[in-house]
Design a protein with these regions (language model features):
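N-terminal leader segment of winged-helix/HTH proteins
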Residues: 1-44
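Terminal interaction helix/tail motif
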Residues: 2-9, 120, 124-163
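Gram-positive cell-envelope targeting signals
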Residues: 13, 23-24, 43, 64, ...
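Generic detection of well-ordered alpha-helical segments
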Residues: 14, 18, 50, 65, ...
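N-terminal helix-turn-helix DNA-binding core of bacterial DNA-binding proteins
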Residues: 29-73
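Canonical helix-turn-helix DNA-binding module
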Residues: 60-103
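Charged, amphipathic alpha-helical coiled-coil/dimerization segments
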Residues: 86-138
């Protein structure tokens, strides 16, 4: 591969990172808009809280350690977010009868509304992404898959090195 091609790939990668940052802000506004259309009035104010609700909804019952492992957040951040979500009425905490040490979380009715809306929006985006992938041959999809797997592994390793 030529140096020019490598530079082009890197430039597009950096552009993708910037677009992803911008998209995060747009996604939250889109979520608020969809929530209003569905008459869901009370919505968490950031996407991380919405994603914690999603994680809890997918894995009930789940504790802080489970959330931190599945979402790659710090334990302190998970504790802060879960405390806020309890206070705001999106989740409840409880202990299992056979384990009084661990605190587990489950969604409230209000949290379930957020979970359901988030799932609906993700399904819509997932379908659009699959349709986009259909424009590539199987060999091209395999190359993209290999690239993304290796890039993700590298970024995860860098993140681990930074902590």
């Amino acid at each position: 591969m030529s140096v020019l091609t490598k530079q082009l790939i890197y430039d597009i990668y950096v552009r993708l990172l910037h677009l992803n940052e911008q998209k995060a802000n747009t996604s939250l506004q889109q979520f608020f808009k969809e929530a209003a259309e569905e008459d869901v009035i009370d919505v968490p104010k950031n996407m991380t809280s919405i994603h914690v609700i999603d994680c809890i909804g997918q894995h009930e019952p789940i504790n802080n350690t489970g959330i931190f492992r599945k979402m790659n957040l710090s334990k302190a951040n998970v504790t802060k977010i879960s405390t806020k979500l309890i206070k705001e009425g999106f989740i409840n905490s409880y202990q299992l009868t056979d384990n009084k040490k661990e605190v587990y979380f489950k969604l409230t009715r209000k949290g379930r509304q957020i979970f359901d809306l988030h799932e609906k929006l993700h399904k819509k985006k997932e379908l659009a992404f699959y349709q986009f992938l259909d424009s590539f041959s199987q060999d091209e999809q395999n190359a993209v898959l290999k690239f993304l797997e290796q890039l993700t592994s590298r970024l995860e390793a860098e993140q681990t090195d930074d902590t």
